[in-house]
Amino acid sequence: MQLVWDAIALHTTPTLALHKEPEVVMVHSGIAVDVLGVGLDRIPQDKQRAILSEFPRLAFKTQFKGCLCNVVRQKPMTTVDNILRDFGIRYVEGFAPPNFADLVANAPFSE
């Protein structure tokens, strides 16, 4: 169960995912190809066409952006230390991202 959790939780954190078990590395790498095109050049063109024919992207970029921006709007505190912050800054009007320096400064301690 821990392996599955790690693969899901770390798939957007290459600085950690690439140093974990092979399954975690593969989940991260597969998602990186699918979402960002990282490593796409290592897949032959005929294979790419076959894959995209079987699994069309169906406006993936637009839909993905919309989903992430909805999370930013509904749960802005979940944007600390992940890709949601970037989408909020770029696409969500009025988004004021949580900032770690502010979190420390506003911690409930007297000193």
Segments predicted by a language model, with ranges:
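Histidine- and acidic-residue-rich, metal-dependent catalytic cores
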Residues: 1-16
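Divalent metal-dependent phosphate-bond-processing catalytic cores, especially two-metal-ion Mg2+/Mn2+ enzymes
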Residues: 13-111
